[in-house]
Amino acid sequence: MQFPSDFIEKYNNLLRDEAEDFFASFDQEAVSAYRTNPLKKQQKDFPDAIPETPWGHYGKISGKSADHATGLVYSQEPAAQMVAQVAAPSKGSRVLDLAAAPGGKSTHLLSYLDNTGLLVSNEINPKRSKILVENIERFGARNVIVTNTSADKLAKVFKNYFDTIVFDGPCSGEGMFRKDPDAIQYWHKEYPNELAQLQKDILSDGLKMLAPGGQLIYSTCTWSPEENEGVVAWILENNPDLELVAIPKLNGMSDGIDFPETARMYPHHFKGEGQFVAKFQDKRVPEQTRIKEGKSNLNKEQKQLWEDFAKKHLKTRLDGLLQVFGDNLYLLPKGLPDLSKVKIARNGLHLGVFKKKRFEPSFALGIALTSDEVVSSIELTQDQFAQYVSGNVVTLDQTHPNGWYQLLVDGNGFGFAKVVGNTVKNFYPKGLRFHL
């Protein structure tokens, strides 16, 4: 792997005796890993568990496998898994993932929340926010909204609101060079300084949203001191209410430069790619805040259609605020402020759509619910799964009463479909379809 001369000089000076091992690590294959999803009812025994993190396993997963399609597994390399683990938000808390795409850290945070509390998952880039929505929907979480806006606009709505803020900042990406060698072409001597300033600009607004007594997790996938310890020093200098919290150094982690409380991950020490993580605690006394919540905007007919569907097909009562956007029905987490001035990419859990005096359940609802929460479900075989994901109707071995059924693959929800006799009509979203 070829590096710019300035990069070589920089890390020879920074790492000294370790520099040779550091550069040699780039000739080794990038480490692949994934996480399992604890929100899913049916779990499996996967091999090669990562000792440092819950739900983590070494290895590769196929994006066309049933485990991936049902949201049971999510691909994420080991070092990146450390960020949400450092955050480890408590159940029922309010969490912000400030720069969230493609969704690895958000889905990991949702694992800790366990369908309680609230996650606001923000991504300013519209194309990347669509990928974020897709990944969160597949994960099956109910307590998350996805926003597509800037930190300054979010701060006007969520001032002093979040118990945990995770900011995995846009960075020079040095830690991903082994995984994505093409990224090297963007690196130049001043690039880390340029990115460090961007990180500070975003944090200037982002920190306004941290509640008294809350925690900030700042991370990057680079080793640049300008973007890491330099930003940590800036945070402490400009935010006297924040103090660093020591991160336990798990196998292969290193202390940060000048800030031993922070953590660095190098590929010649840690079995993974590159990462930096810092944890801050707000010293202010936590306050009880009251949020003026919105009200359901369903009309009488829509309310009746939803209640009829829920009574007939669901065994559980879904907790949250029902809101209609166009003809689409969403379930929003409780405790949200007015979001009318925020660009939203996903308004909570999409329940379905109203069509000509009937209600059709969404794929998102069917993948979020467990089989214990629905009245009727049908387990697809692997051959039937292959037919369904390619957009075909599926023929069952026996007939069923006509109506809506939750589809299951290996016991986990895979959307709703309408069954007529022994035929499963295809309701798998066209944008997700693929051929096996």
Residue ranges and their predicted role:
Residues G92-A101:
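Conserved class I S-adenosyl-L-methionine
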Residues I124-K159:
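S-adenosyl-L-methionine
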Residues K127, D163-I202, C221-N228, L250:
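Mobile active-site "lid"/loop adjacent to the S-adenosyl-L-methionine
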Residues D114, L210-P212:
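Helix-to-beta-strand junctions that scaffold the AdoMet/dcAdoMet cofactor pocket
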Residues M1-L14, E18-K41, E273-F276, K283-L436:
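Polybasic, low-complexity RNA-engagement segments
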Residues P102-N115:
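Conserved SAM-binding loop of SAM-dependent methyltransferases across substrates and taxa
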Residues S90-K91, A155-V166:
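A short acidic, Gly/Pro-enriched loop at the edge of an enzyme's catalytic core
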Residues F162, Q215-Y218, W223-Y330:
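Class I S-adenosyl-L-methionine
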